[in-house]
Regions:
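Glycine/small-residue-rich hydrophobic helix-like segments
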Residues: 208-249
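Cytoplasmic juxtamembrane regions at transmembrane-helix boundaries
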Residues: 6-10, 106-125, 185-209, 276-280
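Hydrophobic, ordered structural segments
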Residues: 35-36, 58, 84-184
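Short, membrane-exposed interhelical loops at transmembrane-helix boundaries
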Residues: 74-79, 153-157, 200, 235-256
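Membrane-helix interface motif
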Residues: 60-71, 136-151, 227-238
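An N-terminus-focused feature that recognizes amino-terminal "leader" regions
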Residues: 2-91, 95, 276
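Alpha-helical transmembrane segments and their immediate juxtamembrane interface regions
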Residues: 101, 170-173, 177, 245-278
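Alpha-helical transmembrane segments and their helix-start/interface "positive-inside/aromatic belt" motifs
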Residues: 35-52, 115-128, 206-217
Length: 280
């Protein structure tokens, strides 16, 4: 019999919520183990890898004086200009949105016993949704400028009294994510996500280590730009991935660093494909 009074009602509600959460975690765990999940992982990670390879190629061109936006929007624009651009964008968009849903399922399944893994999975899911949605917008004939969107949001934030603080915190969080990527590469922690056959382990290590380090450095620079924008109260200083990579061309030795990061991003893209094939 349910408890009487407000306290009893609250207790019943709490137990009901706990049971619902447990059922959701159990259902998510079953979905995660389904054979279809491995196909979603393989296709989604391959799409993710393709996007990174294209971004890296554009960044390499920027280092040698070519134009282009070395970010997700630039990658989608480049894909759209290929003979199979429309089909490629639809495949990439759908695959990444599906991969995002898969990541959210993992987050729910891990939320009770592995909180850190759940947070990481949820973060990946959000990232995949953003990139997948961008691909679908381009597939439908639309366009998104990542740098303009970043500057617009930063301008709006800086108009509020606590805006600079919010922008600075955002930058520090992004930089923290970048540092985590670097650490994951240096410590070979990416093997937590991929289980290649023994004969391919060194290949995956040769891809994952520089790939994670390069992506981590790029993301850290993005975070740094947000902090600079917050300190200078200038939204124009904030930038996304393209802004971060373009900024390297203005500092001594930056072009060399940009070439290294560009190659690293392409290597990371190949790693993503291996992760899709040999996901743990």
């Amino acid at each position: 019999m349910s408890g009487d009074g407000p306290d009893g009602a609250l207790s019943d509600a709490a137990h009901g919520a706990h049971r619902a959460a447990h059922k959701a975690q159990h259902a998510a765990a079953e979905v995660e183990q389904h054979r279809a999940a491995s196909w979603v992982e393989a296709l989604g990670q391959s799409a993710n890898g393709l996007v990174h390879i294209v971004i890296g190629a554009i960044a390499l061109g920027v280092a040698f004086g070519a134009g282009g936006s070395a970010d997700q929007s630039g990658a989608m624009r480049a894909l759209r200009e290929t003979p199979i651009g429309g089909v490629a964008l639809w495949v990439v968009g759908v695959a990444l949105v599906a991969l995002a849903l898969h990541a959210f399922v993992i987050a729910v399944a891990a939320s009770r016993r592995h909180r850190r893994d759940a947070v990481r999975a949820a973060g990946r899911g959000i990232g995949h949704v953003v990139v997948g949605t961008t691909a679908l917008v381009f597939a439908l004939g639309g366009s998104i400028d990542g740098e303009e969107a970043t500057e617009s949001v930063s301008t709006t934030v800086l108009q509020h009294p606590v805006g600079p603080w919010l922008l600075a915190v955002t930058g520090l969080v992004i930089a923290g994510v970048g540092v985590a990527f670097v650490a994951r590469g240096v410590r070979r922690k990416f093997f937590d996500d991929v289980a290649p056959p023994r004969r391919f382990r060194r290949l995956v290590e040769a891809l994952g280590t520089p790939g994670f380090v390069a992506k981590g450095i790029a993301v850290t620079i993005v975070g740094g730009l947000f902090v600079v924008a917050a300190v200078s109260h200038d939204a124009g200083e904030a930038g996304g991935l393209d802004g971060a990579l373009q900024s390297l061309t203005t500092v001594p030795g930056g072009v060399v660093a940009l070439v290294a990061i560009a190659v690293g991003l392409m290597v990371y893209g190949v790693y993503c494909v291996t992760r899709g094939v040999w996901a743990r």
